[in-house]
UniProtKB/Swiss-Prot annotation:
Belongs to the AB hydrolase superfamily. Methylesterase family. Pfam families: Abhydrolase_6 (PF12697). One of its GO terms (molecular function) is hydrolase activity, acting on ester bonds. The keyword DNA-binding does not apply. The active site is at 102 (acyl-ester intermediate), 222 (charge relay system), 250 (charge relay system). It comes from the Eukaryota. Methylesterase shown to have carboxylesterase activity in vitro. Its EC number is 3.1.1.-. Transmembrane segments: none annotated. This is Methylesterase 8. Keywords: Hydrolase. PANTHER family: METHYLESTERASE 2-RELATED, METHYLESTERASE FAMILY MEMBER.
Length: 272
């Protein structure tokens, strides 16, 4: 009788430890920016996984190895469909850590508005972060007004986004390893800002998008979305947490993946 009681207690303790470990594990969902793909997280993904977490890196529509063409995608919601499908498939009791880079911030916002109860925190990595008072296109339109034609260094924005090699080298990846620059140039695909569509969309809601905890990671040496503009978005719609990264360009996931991974782990732990 006594031995059975001890065995029962030990079983409870073991089950409790296993359950505790499972609860500590996070599910990170990594969302790339315009003209990129899931491949751009190739340095960060294994670092998060090495810490024992589950990681999903998505190709959005017409990105990475997704077979669709950008000419067949007319709305930001269509573009974001792979993330929406993933969020729909999650069990109701599972919460993920959403991480969006650059234009991926708009995709995050769409998912946050639809699935606020399935997200523990959303992390905006030097990305566009909309508010709930203005049109979803507002942060893009204001950003565009800060750029001159010369600033784009021969890049195309209409009808589709194609960043020039010069812009990529000097404004996007100026601090990243040359191998990552070459990879970016080899794997580039045209994108879209979907400005017309976003300008017609309803504002993101406080009940949905606004109810999800947000963290913003500032890249201080970003020459694409400048630190000044990142801080304007932060002031415009303050997140719950702001973290700075020095010595990083527009792709800290390339130039300082370990530091970025450490920040993501700390944020996930804080909001778990």
């Amino acid at each position: 009788m006594y031995e059975n009681g001890i065995s029962f207690i030990i079983s409870l303790l073991i089950c409790g430890c296993v359950k505790s470990e499972e609860m500590m594990k996070q599910h990170f969902v990594l969302v790339h920016g315009s003209c990129l793909g899931a491949w751009c997280w190739y340095k960060v993904k294994p670092l998060l996984e090495a810490s024992g977490h589950r990681v999903t890196a998505l190709d959005l529509a017409a990105c990475g190895i997704d077979t669709r063409s950008i000419t067949d995608i007319s709305t930001c919601e269509q573009y974001s469909e792979p993330l929406i499908q993933l969020m729909t498939s999650l069990p109701n009791d599972e919460k993920v850590v959403l991480v969006g880079h650059s234009y991926g911030g708009l995709t995050l916002a769409i998912a946050m508005d639809k699935f606020p109860d399935k997200i523990s925190v959303s992390v905006f990595v030097t990305s566009f972060m909309p508010d709930t008072k203005n049109s979803p296109s507002f942060v893009l339109e204001k950003f565009a007004s800060t750029m001159t034609p010369e600033d784009w260094m021969g890049s195309e924005l209409e009808p589709y986004v194609v960043f020039s090699a010069e812009f990529t080298k000097h404004r996007i990846l100026q601090l990243s390893p040359i191998e990552d620059l070459e990879l970016r140039l080899l794997l580039k695909r045209p994108g879209s800002l979907f400005l017309n569509d976003l300008s017609r969309m309803k504002n993101f809601s406080e009940k949905g998008y606004g109810s999800v905890p947000r963290a913003y990671i500032v890249s201080k040496d970003d020459h694409t979305i400048s630190e000044e503009y990142q801080r304007w978005m932060i002031d415009n719609y303050p997140p719950n947490l702001v973290i700075e990264m020095e010595g990083t360009d527009h792709l800290p996931l390339f130039c300082k993946p370990q530091l970025l991974s450490d920040h993501l782990l700390a944020i996930a732990d804080k909001f778990s």
